[in-house]
Amino acid sequence: RSSDLENGELGEVYLAKAHAVRRRGIPTWGVFLNEAEQGGGALIDIGTHALDMTLWIMNNYKPKRVSGSVYKKLGKGDTAGNAFGPWDNEHITVEDSAFGYITMENGATVFLEASWALNTTDTREQKVTLCGTRAGADMNDGVCINSVCSGELAETRPLLRQTGVPGEDLAKNEADFEAEMWLDALDTGKPTLVRPEQAMVVTQILEAIYESARTGKEVEL
């Protein structure tokens, strides 16, 4: 979690956007395209990661109500240009895109966009945008903090995980950090970065988006 957020440099974060958008990136393996076996498409595949990261960065796991839309528009169409090659467009039964609007108990809004296939060039996956009362942050090209400084609009880019010591920067990849975290939790009893109850909230929100799309109504949590 960024020190800029933990230190309150963004102020009150009242809007967040969770991005998981591919132009053409429909999986072609496993049971990804089978709703009966997979449970859903782009939303539970890549949308879940973007939402999980957004709630964790905000440190806000108290949703109040959810509305959403789910679409099966491009999955049955032309498979040209897909990052993973042609998919089975005759038997796909899951959504290719989904969008959720989440209102938190403190009034903050989270907008979630998830797609395997969408006619857009604005493609961002596992990215988060935050808008606060003092500053904003996005991950379009690394982490960028936008604010007003000395009467002018300003942008700063924190040097994350850089020590200034040659050979020490990024010495461990994400998989190494994750493995060490789990081993440390097992050995010492320390809590992991993401708690089971937090993961449950993510699942509740995803289910609420599907329910809202089915019923056409807002879902209270």
Which stretches of residues belong to each language-model region?
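Contiguous beta-strand/loop segments that form the cofactor/metal-binding neighborhood of enzyme cores
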Residues: 52-147, 176-191
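Predominantly a Rossmann-like dinucleotide-binding segment in NAD(P)-dependent oxidoreductases
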Residues: 1-92, 216
